[in-house]
């Protein structure tokens, strides 16, 4: 570090605008301070008032979401992640976050540090991460740039997670032209903690010491938060220095040291250093605790020479945390972190001044009110909204605008859909991840509608899933978001769990675009509708706006991370694969289900007819609740041999996947006569689940449903050792061997990336 400060640039309006602040925001800063900010203060405001840190364009909308529940142990925004009581003295911390912009310019490091950051949020709560999931979106794999991004992101996730020692147990990958220049990389972490061992983030006690723990500080990631709050354009490649560099082995040491320090009772409060680094941690901890801090930046361990206060405050170097402890506990902290070869350097003190003050060799370089920077007094905007003009065209679509299928075309159509990268096997992805490390994984990727992990020592498990179909949200933002929540919960239900709470990652376009903001607002309404109906409160999450590229905005994509509890880990986990020859097949639907089958918004319409049109598929939330409740009851009673929800690709793909995932089994099923064959087989209306039961349990299934008047079980057929045979009305339409279905399903992704 230099002994004396270099002369910082003179702060003026032009410099503020270069930092991403608006004219109005700079005027607000001048008014609040009554003076021109220092260069370091300007940097602090620029990152903390960025959308990435402040949620200034989303807070008003997010406050409308359901956030209360009997099992929730932390309020939204109060801690680093959501915290849910799952019984037996255990709590689950879970959260999903985005790393979209960094991954667009540096896919490997961008994805890797996204994984590292979300895990830190979890173990900062005192919870040990037990599994990870991801939700990824890319453009067409026909483009070489997309293949480069896809490969880099998957390797980054795999290398970091595998080295860190936490299994990646599930996720989803979609490929749509709308994500061509702006991939989405959303990472979710789930951890477990004893309810009496949780750690807090608020710095509440003046006189406590402020300790920087973990890795040394460098120049990587400076203004990463600001970069994440701007659109991607042709010049974004120049922002590679804004992408952080992660080290999973250091993070593993940080995990063990931090959990040990929390167990030993020497951590008063703790905050991960993510976006905006020391700045965000210090200001957020002070704002939450109603206190202040004095920070001595010349004490910060650095790995590069000549770093200035501005750079130290804004660095986003990874694998660092800010710990507040009682006086006298810093020696114990230093011993614990030193044992793991990590820094534990006292850099400041909690104060009662209500100011965060930064010093360099006792010279004050910044003094700001944390409430103005990270608390309740940050700017909050409600932007103009306008219904998108494109909806006039998409809603004009009628299913009859495209020709129906002839029976002879069904097999080719089905294999085409099974070979679509959106539906096809993601084995190429999963095989790059360690899915079994730590031996908690009961059901891994692809084996069920959701992953299931063991809660050791309890007899329980967790069912976890990420979900969102951006095409649905594009066509109908409110209903599409409802479907995202409903399907995530339905997947957890089909895997044997009871959904209890959700986290969300809101990926949308430029909030200054009224059409993009309208979609965001409607999607938040939809998430709220479904969360309330399904009794799955929102525990927190992430907002990523400005997801635009030179060709336009992404599909609005509110990714849902759903948490469910499996009450009996030995009997309830349920596979998506057929289990036994002779089992009876049923389709669970709402009792009065008579909604016209349509192909609107379907993978069939997109893949076969190259159309993204119509409305989002039908969903009635009361019907959805009824079907999920019935499915949960049937699984608890031990009647269900396999369960798979009807979603992308419709009923035909659902049945085909059940065959593909089984060990040499097939099925014979008969569907009612339909006005349109394509809609009956490939329409994606919601609230449908295919289950199989032992032949002797068919009557028991009917009896069990008497307590669920809103649901009926339609007999489809039986499990066989032969092909997949489908009859619609009286007409056979499909006779395909398991091998013929499996080949395109397994080959699509490897063929596309090579």
Swiss-Prot record:
EC number(s) stated in the UniProt entry for this protein: 6.3.5.3
Tagged with keyword S-adenosyl-L-methionine: no
UniProt: Mg(2+) 2 binding residues: 121, 272
Binding site for ATP: 55, 95, 504, 541
Pfam families hit by this protein: AIRS, AIRS_C, FGAR-AT_linker
Keyword entries, A-Z: ATP-binding, Cytoplasm, Ligase, Magnesium, Metal-binding, Nucleotide-binding, Purine biosynthesis
Broad class of the protein's primary localization: cytoplasm
Subcellular location: Cytoplasm
Recorded superkingdom: Bacteria
Record: residues binding Mg(2+) 1: 97, 542
One GO-annotated biological process of the protein: 'de novo' IMP biosynthetic process
PANTHER family per the UniProt record, alphabetical: PHOSPHORIBOSYLFORMYLGLYCINAMIDINE SYNTHASE SUBUNIT PURL
Protein family per UniProt: Belongs to the FGAMS family.
Functional summary from the UniProt entry: Part of the phosphoribosylformylglycinamidine synthase complex involved in the purines biosynthetic pathway. Catalyzes the ATP-dependent conversion of formylglycinamide ribonucleotide (FGAR) and glutamine to yield formylglycinamidine ribonucleotide (FGAM) and glutamate. The FGAM synthase complex is composed of three subunits. PurQ produces an ammonia molecule by converting glutamine to glutamate. PurL transfers the ammonia molecule to FGAR to form FGAM in an ATP-dependent manner.
Protein name in UniProt: Phosphoribosylformylglycinamidine synthase subunit PurL
Species this chain originates from: Salinibacter ruber (strain DSM 13855 / M31)
Gene from which this protein is expressed: purL
